[in-house]
Amino acid sequence: MRYSPHSPTEVEEMLFSIGMKNKAELFADIPDRLKLGRDLELGPGLTEMELNRHLKELAGKNMNLDDYPCFLGAGAYDHYIPAALDQLLLRSEFYTAYTPYQPEISQGILQAIFEYQTMICALTGMDVANASLYDGASALAEACQMACEGSRRRKVILPATLHPEYLEVVKSYAISGKMEIIMAPEQEGIIDKEATLALLDRDSACLVIQQPNFFGCIEEIAGWEKAVHANKSLLIMVVNPISLGLLKSPGEWGADIVVGEGQPLGNPLSFGGPYLGFMACSKKYMRKMPGRLVGQSVDSNEETCYVLTLQAREQHIRREQASSNICSNEALNALAASIYLSLVGRQGLVDIAARCHQLAIYARRQMENYGLSLKYPQAFFNEFAVELDDPARINRLLLEQGIIGGYELPGALLLAFTEKRSRAEIDRLAALIGGECR
């Protein structure tokens, strides 16, 4: 069937209805120098088979993670995604980014979101989780805003070890004037505890700790909760969900709000998005939580049902008085996360986290064999920074050799290791970097 959107008669009728004689008159406001003035020079049409071949040729110009081992992390990670995930995710019942506006006829997706919230709570050790936010950075900004509004304080203490893009997003929220950002210093790759505690005062709404932090280092969490709560401030933790397969949960550390980037949970890198932000908190703060919340209830027949609960917090009801302006969210990505966690299971997540950590330990040894040193003398999960004079040059070299290198820091290269990497790939990485730096 040919695509014929409007017949000449229909075009004439539309022009007549707006008082125009012809199409040239309709576009008279556009300067002639900006008009093409000729027909498009399109080639002959392609068959489906020819078009498929052509698109594959174009796609072949991209760097494919199936062909290029990737050691780039810094917030987004190349984890393996089980084949079953996409088959379930792309079912027509699920294939939307929206949380439903008519929940009584959308029980399937509501239950899926409820299961996602349950898994996030189990993972973080918190009481309540929402149906997702846009990404990890916006989740942190929302958490800081939540802390300020709940405590009626303005100061948000952010560490120098926080992901710089997260910092920029929080700064964009602070433009409103309701939030004042106070930066806490770092010492050897982790938060300077003594200097940071000295920043706490009566107007401090919260302290943020990223674990592992942007540099890959494991922060010393012990003692923070007691000091922060003694000041009647909130402790917000930013976490890598995969790391929770090995590390203590934020709930065990006494965190009040937990946020993070959910991309490692079954979501592809996908040129930077879409991703999802997860958020969980203690029950006492749930009425200040942004975004949708799905709850379990019973219907008039005493059957289990699922509902959007505590909607009075949201902007479609309270407008400018809402806890947040977030509306449509990343429900499809959240569903991917819940399918991923269901497929790998509790022990599977532990195994994935352990393999990531073991490969990072192995990589450190291989780097040290070539005389390379880590920038920071701290424990790490699956990411560390290697000291290099010119990390950009090393990255170019690696790319020429078919390897996607790390994130460039001043005088260092931040490298990430996931369960997809092999020891042979790490050996080659270390040999290329070490050989070039000798």
Swiss-Prot record:
It holds the Pfam family GDC-P. It comes from the Bacteria. InterPro entries: GcvPA, GDC-P_N, GDC_P, PyrdxlP-dep_Trfase, PyrdxlP-dep_Trfase_major, PyrdxlP-dep_Trfase_small. It is an enzyme of class 1 (oxidoreductase). Keywords: Oxidoreductase. GO terms for biological process: glycine decarboxylation via glycine cleavage system; nucleoside metabolic process. This is Probable glycine dehydrogenase (decarboxylating) subunit 1. Its EC number is 1.4.4.2. It catalyses: N(6)-[(R)-lipoyl]-L-lysyl-[glycine-cleavage complex H protein] + glycine + H(+) = N(6)-[(R)-S(8)-aminomethyldihydrolipoyl]-L-lysyl-[glycine-cleavage complex H protein] + CO2. Belongs to the GcvP family. N-terminal subunit subfamily. One of its GO terms (molecular function) is glycine dehydrogenase (decarboxylating) activity. The glycine cleavage system catalyzes the degradation of glycine. The P protein binds the alpha-amino group of glycine through its pyridoxal phosphate cofactor; CO(2) is released and the remaining methylamine moiety is then transferred to the lipoamide cofactor of the H protein. The glycine cleavage system is composed of four proteins: P, T, L and H. In this organism, the P 'protein' is a heterodimer of two subunits. It comes from Syntrophomonas wolfei subsp. wolfei (strain DSM 2245B / Goettingen).
